[in-house]
Amino acid sequence: KDFLYLEKQVDIYKLGSEEYEPKKESLDLCFTSPPYFDTEKYSLESTQSFVKFPTENEWINGFLKKTIENCYIGLKENRYMLINIADTPKHKFIEKETIRIAKELGFVQEDTLQLTLSSVMGAGYKYEPIFVFRKESK
């Protein structure tokens, strides 16, 4: 796709967010909506996070933490990371772990937005959080 209208360079990478190592302080924004461990299985390929990290603990430390860490390294000071991730009936602590990891790495939580998901006929709307974190100045 042609992104010249943005008048900025756009780089697109095809690899997992836990593998992408951005240049230090090169990003203005980091937005991610990672799969919720083994709840969203797109394929059984070895590139999938739930295949690479088969237990919840391995996934949190090997995938989620590394993804957040890469955002922190890449973000410029006072820039934002937004992460859409939610607890599931099977995994009830993903949200708390996300917040804990982000704060441990040095992010400040500034807000939590609500993402409105498609409604199911007669069931009303479902919401998921989008956590907003800022990388503080040193």
Task: List the model feature ranges, each with a label.
Residues 1-138:
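Class I S-adenosyl-L-methionine-dependent methyltransferase catalytic core
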